[in-house]
Amino acid sequence: MRLLVAPLLLAWVAGATAAVPVVPWHVPCPPQCACQIRPWYTPRSSYREATTVDCNDLFLTAVPPALPAGTQTLLLQSNSIVRVDQSELGYLANLTELDLSQNSFSDARDCDFHALPQLLSLHLEENQLTRLEDHSFAGLASLQELYLNHNQLYRIAPRAFSGLSNLLRLHLNSNLLRAIDSRWFEMLPNLEILMIGGNKVDAILDMNFRPLANLRSLVLAGMNLREISDYALEGLQSLESLSFYDNQLARVPRRALEQVPGLKFLDLNKNPLQRVGPGDFANMLHLKELGLNNMEELVSIDKFALVNLPELTKLDITNNPRLSFIHPRAFHHLPQMETLMLNNNALSALHQQTVESLPNLQEVGLHGNPIRCDCVIRWANATGTRVRFIEPQSTLCAEPPDLQRLPVREVPFREMTDHCLPLISPRSFPPSLQVASGESMVLHCRALAEPEPEIYWVTPAGLRLTPAHAGRRYRVYPEGTLELRRVTAEEAGLYTCVAQNLVGADTKTVSVVVGRALLQPGRDEGQGLELRVQETHPYHILLSWVTPPNTVSTNLTWSSASSLRGQGATALARLPRGTHSYNITRLLQATEYWACLQVAFADAHTQLACVWARTKEATSCHRALGDRPGLIAILALAVLLLAAGLAAHLGTGQPRKGVGGRRPLPPAWAFWGWSAPSVRVVSAPLVLPWNPGRKLPRSSEGETLLPPLSQNS
């Protein structure tokens, strides 16, 4: 992809040079050096034939004496030269290119260039330069190319480049610079190409490049940049090519890009973008090529991500292992788009609406994707499809199993239905995620289907979050992104994304761990988890505990001592996440019970805490009923007869609306308070922490939770 003018130009020059024959130059030549007439291209790409003295790789410690007076190009690369005096080069009046790269210079002042007024190109890359003082290149008024890359420069004085008003190309990449000073560029009004990547600068400040009104190509690759300030590119009205390759940009620098309206080539490859959102690339009227490749975190290209790019002809979005979703309406008003490269991603399909939105599209690359050959990709085999597949024999179906490994273009049209289930890509978000307490969490869930699916999330507490939901902590965006602000340990647990349409649904779950894991696998059971007896009564016991962070589920079991000897049943309650107490009821008086709390955590390990408790002996008030089974039986019989009479009376009329008609009577043992003859299970939605006199609880989003329909209300 032609994103950077300078590298391509240099590659073209090298290729063209290799094709032109080298002619011997018959002059007295220094020992072991080669004197020839070679093709040469000026910094403005004009072709010339230059008299060349090649003394590369000769282990020289000084410039050879008695060089031919007509030398135009002097190559001294890969030697051990540490100093160049004026007397060694001053007599070479025609010298236009000097290559001193890969030598041993540590100070630019060790190079005396005052007597080289014709020099156009100077190579000092791959030396040991550490500083550039003011006026370091005085006397080089004609210089157009300066290569200082791959040194150890950590300081450049404000006027280091004074006198270089004709400089066109400056290479400062791969040094030790920590800041960029706009005063450097005040001396370079005609600079067209600046390569300053590979320096771990702290930040690019507003108007850092403002003096460079004629700059056409700017390379900011490999600088560990996390953000670009809104006015960092202010003043670059001539900029055509821009590279942010291999940085740490988590979002597209939209405001900064607005400052370069003439941009034609943009390279954002190898950045940790998670999504390209609406309007991230909008109204860039001259953009021709855009690269969004090799992004490990990229999940989706959302609706209207690319809007009003009238000159865009090629879009590269390749080698993104988690990119599983391109919205059907991701592209709008891209009339000149010809080539769409989407190979080697995690895409299950490319929607027909996406293709139809690109009226001039000629070819698309989808090879290397896990294509699901169903209704969404059906357009590929429709008659009259104008779009050509790049590498069609490598564009294969991954699903369904009976079409696996079959080229997409060879699947019969009738094999693909009109409607299909939603599919959430397994790579859209990881199975588990650790978040520091107090930070924000963002999860992206996307799905393609026909009809278009609805997406919502379910929290560990069972709260359903839809795009219409906007609480204090949670927010769901229309395309399925869940944002949780200021995460606490209470929000840890399983989050489920649900994508559904009229055909069916698909789900995907992520386990969220908040903060440092307090509980690690392999620790002794019960360590850090304690079950306490808060209150004991003749027929119920109140237990409490402190729920550790990152809890996924909590189960409480209890049984009497006789049950442990095989003479009774064990009861089980599945408790909602966040429950801190439970009231065990329907117990026998003066009886020992064994209760155990089992907690499961997000990292798949569990902990167990147990406690013994004994119910109190019933008082006279309790014995009035508790010790007189005959009286209880009479009362129960009376209740049964009353219920039967009431049922017979109601049976003669119509069922009451809104009540549901007749309901079956509960089993007889329920009236005596006896335990069920098998394991008693209390479902999670019907259990809440026991708190006498409590008001109706509310969720973290302010929604009222109904009280449990059990004896623990």
Swiss-Prot record:
One of its GO terms (biological process) is signal transduction. The keyword Manganese does not apply. Residues 652-713 are cytoplasmic. It is found in: Membrane. Gene3D superfamilies: Immunoglobulins, Ribonuclease Inhibitor. Residues 20-69 form the LRRNT domain. SMART domains: IG, IGc2, LRR_SD22, LRR_TYP, LRRCT. The chain crosses the membrane at residues 631-651. Glycans are attached at N94, N381, N555, N583. Residues 19-630 are extracellular. GO terms for cellular component: extracellular matrix; extracellular space; membrane. This is Leucine-rich repeat neuronal protein 2. It comes from Homo sapiens.
